[in-house]
């Protein structure tokens, strides 16, 4: 069976890093059909929309999507619906992507690159699972109005709605428990149940779902404490499951524990296992075209694609082992380079991973 992969390089460094991930996928000699399409600012320049119908159709008809990055300062003056970042939101909605998986792994060779002391972060391996479809990002009503009453009656006020449906919480909780079951059987649910009704609802439902997973140790933590504990003692965590807003913030915080966001892959999945795979970093237009971007997060995202959407765990293991090999050999792109290591370009890092694949 041939697996069709939609390849959407995007903007900034997106094309450079996606190119290296494509090379790795092709080197595995698998029945893959890689089909490219424009997205983000690159698509707007051609079609006056960040997510053209043909690109969306390709993504919907593919087994998985390999995504680079979108965004550039030159598009910041566009109406919001035409900005490059709307492409990723449109893809999440159209594909029904509800679970974002972001590993935060500190490779031993990069321990000194972390902003924390090695004795605190050594051995770090956290999986943060973020719900993508609900919460304050998508709740309605929202907008700007004149306050009708209260302490600020008559003033303009901005407002949003934080909401979660029961089915949304239950399905992301199950992803959390299933993931924890495959790892160290520890799941921490992060909320703000001491203040927010939405969070208390979340916590109650997670506890209900936990009864189906008696082998998984469930704990709860308020988001403010979780933010502190990620810096104070990050190794206490194995799998974290949380809502859209909290997950957005905590996953970026966890990323910096690893030394470089250029090392971190991510996967966004729907109920059928179809997924969008992208590096956790942005488009970095300031370094685009210079050949210095780190492609490893995108290559590791390709490994996640093999594992989660194509069920090709052995091939995913090979890619991840190849990345560990190049790091052990002392090869570094500019973002993770330090004294005693060898600085390489984007394409040279890709070459090294291909060589390590054998």
From Swiss-Prot:
Keyword terms: Amino-acid biosynthesis, Branched-chain amino acid biosynthesis, Cytoplasm, Leucine biosynthesis, Magnesium, Manganese, Metal-binding, NAD, Oxidoreductase
GO cellular component: cytosol
Residue numbers binding substrate: 92, 102, 130, 224
Binding-site residues for Mg(2+), renumbered to this chain: 224, 248, 252
EC numbers on record: 1.1.1.85
Catalytic EC class: oxidoreductase
Catalytic activity: (2R,3S)-3-isopropylmalate + NAD(+) = 4-methyl-2-oxopentanoate + CO2 + NADH
Record-listed NAD(+) binding positions: 282-294
Entry-linked InterPro entries: IsoCit/isopropylmalate_DH_CS, IsoPropMal-DH-like_dom, Isopropylmalate_DH
GO biological-process terms attached to the record: L-leucine biosynthetic process
Cofactor note: Binds 1 Mg(2+) or Mn(2+) ion per subunit.
Positions bearing the site annotation: Important for catalysis: 137, 192
Cofactor(s) needed: Mg(2+); Mn(2+)
Location in the cell: Cytoplasm
GO MF annotations in UniProt: 3-isopropylmalate dehydrogenase activity; magnesium ion binding; NAD binding
Pfam family, one: Iso_dh
Pathway assigned in UniProt: Amino-acid biosynthesis; L-leucine biosynthesis; L-leucine from 3-methyl-2-oxobutanoate: step 3/4
Main location: cytoplasm
Family: Belongs to the isocitrate and isopropylmalate dehydrogenases family. LeuB type 1 subfamily.
Family annotation (HAMAP family): LeuB_type1 (MF_01033)
Cited function: Catalyzes the oxidation of 3-carboxy-2-hydroxy-4-methylpentanoate (3-isopropylmalate) to 3-carboxy-4-methyl-2-oxopentanoate. The product decarboxylates to 4-methyl-2 oxopentanoate.
Protein name from the UniProt record: 3-isopropylmalate dehydrogenase
Gene symbol of the encoding locus: leuB
């Amino acid at each position: 069976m041939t697996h069709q992969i939609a390849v959407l390089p995007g903007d900034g460094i997106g094309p450079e890093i996606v190119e290296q991930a494509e090379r790795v996928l092709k080197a595995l000699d698998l029945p893959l059909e890689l089909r490219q399409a424009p997205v983000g600012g690159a698509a707007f320049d051609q079609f006056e929309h960040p997510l053209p119908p043909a690109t969306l159709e390709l993504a919907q008809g593919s087994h998985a999507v390999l995504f680079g990055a979108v965004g550039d300062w030159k598009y910041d003056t566009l109406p919001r619906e035409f900005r490059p970042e709307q492409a990723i939101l449109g893809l999440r909605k159209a594909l029904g992507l509800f679970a974002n998986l972001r590993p935060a792994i500190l490779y031993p060779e990069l321990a000194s690159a972390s902003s924390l002391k090695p004795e605190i972060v050594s051995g770090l391996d956290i999986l943060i699972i973020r719900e993508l479809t609900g919460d304050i990002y998508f709740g309605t009503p929202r907008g700007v109005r004149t306050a009708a009453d209260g302490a600020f009656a008559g003033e303009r006020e901005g407002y949003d709605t934080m909401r979660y449906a029961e089915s949304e919480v239950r399905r992301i909780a199950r992803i959390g428990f299933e993931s924890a079951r495959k790892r160290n059987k520890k799941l921490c649910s992060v909320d703000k149940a001491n203040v927010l009704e939405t969070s208390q609802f979340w916590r109650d439902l997670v506890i209900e779902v936990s009864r189906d997973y008696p082998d998984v140790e469930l704990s709860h933590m308020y988001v403010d404490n979780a933010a502190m504990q990620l810096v104070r003692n990050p190794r206490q965590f194995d799998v974290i499951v949380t809502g859209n807003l909290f997950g957005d913030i905590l996953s970026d915080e966890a990323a910096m524990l690893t030394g470089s966001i250029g090392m971190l892959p991510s996967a966004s999945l729907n109920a059928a296992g179809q997924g969008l795979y992208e590096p956790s970093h942005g488009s970095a237009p300031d370094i685009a075209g210079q050949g210095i971007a780190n492609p490893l997060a995108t290559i590791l995202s390709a490994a996640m694609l093999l594992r989660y959407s194509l069920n090709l765990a052995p091939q995913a293991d090979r890619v991840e082992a190849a990345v560990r090999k190049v790091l052990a050999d002392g090869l570094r792109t500019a973002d993770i380079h330090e004294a005693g290591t060898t600085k390489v370009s984007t394409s040279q890092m890709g070459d090294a991973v291909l060589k390590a694949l054998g």
